[in-house]
Amino acid sequence: MTNGNGTPPETAPSPQLNVLAQYTKDFSFENPNSPASLAPQQQPPSINVQINVGASNVAENDYEVVLKVEGKAEHAGKLMFSFELAYAGVFRIVNVPQENLHPLVMIECPRLLFPFAREIVATAVRDGGFPPLMLDPIDFVSLYRQNMERQAAAQQQPS
């Protein structure tokens, strides 16, 4: 196919997302009531997990994305274990329209990081003497929308 003057039409360069690095930025696991917390329990513990995503531009087309995973397990009002993980990646993103850049950084990049963070948490909990904690998959689209709605509501609040 040609553009009318005998030359093929110009195509826009294809979008690219490259993972330059992945790393544990910060990690903590606490088992404050051991060895008592390791005894068999009649009921499963109550487990609470929080997920947050942050990003910063570190070079012209490079973004550091930090996936924060924090959680704790409690049984009968006592803390069994807690963990905090900041797992990060540096991503190079080129040929992406500006209006698509923020969602790409805040949805797709953490989606790529999540399986690695999940493995770190599962291994740490297992190594702490408990059954591995297998985190459920995260809907990063919903998380992104919730954060955008929260930011919009905060901006509408009178100062």
Curated annotation (Swiss-Prot):
GO function term, MF aspect, one: unfolded protein binding
InterPro entries per the UniProt record, alphabetical: SecB (IPR003708), SecB-like_sf (IPR035958)
Location in or out of the cell: Cytoplasm
Keyword annotations: Chaperone, Cytoplasm, Protein transport, Translocation, Transport
GO biological process: protein folding; protein tetramerization; protein transport
GO cellular component term, pick one: cytoplasm
Pfam families per the UniProt record, alphabetical: SecB
Function: One of the proteins required for the normal export of preproteins out of the cell cytoplasm. It is a molecular chaperone that binds to a subset of precursor proteins, maintaining them in a translocation-competent state. It also specifically binds to its receptor SecA.
Subunit structure as annotated in this protein's UniProt entry: Homotetramer, a dimer of dimers. One homotetramer interacts with 1 SecA dimer.
HAMAP family in alphabetical order: SecB
Protein name as catalogued: Protein-export protein SecB
Species lineage: Bacteria, Pseudomonadati, Pseudomonadota, Alphaproteobacteria, Hyphomicrobiales
